[in-house]
């Protein structure tokens, strides 16, 4: 489940 970490960064970066 590495996509979860990516999605979190995307929301935080936005």
UniProtKB/Swiss-Prot annotation:
- Name its cellular compartments: Secreted
Q: Which UniProt keywords apply?
A: Amidation, Amphibian defense peptide, Pyrrolidone carboxylic acid, Secreted
The modified positions for Methionine amide read 14
Query: Where, per the database record, does this protein carry Pyrrolidone carboxylic acid?
Result: 1
Task: Output the Gene Ontology cellular-component terms.
Answer: extracellular region
One GO BP annotation of this record: regulation of insulin secretion
Could you say which tissues express the protein in this record? Expressed by the skin glands.
Write down the InterPro entries for this protein, in alphabetical order. Bombesin (IPR000874)
Q: What does this protein do?
A: Stimulates smooth muscle contraction. Role in induction of hypothermia, stimulation of DNA replication and release of many gastrointestinal hormones.
Family named by the database record = Belongs to the bombesin/neuromedin-B/ranatensin family.
Name this protein carries in UniProt: Bombesin
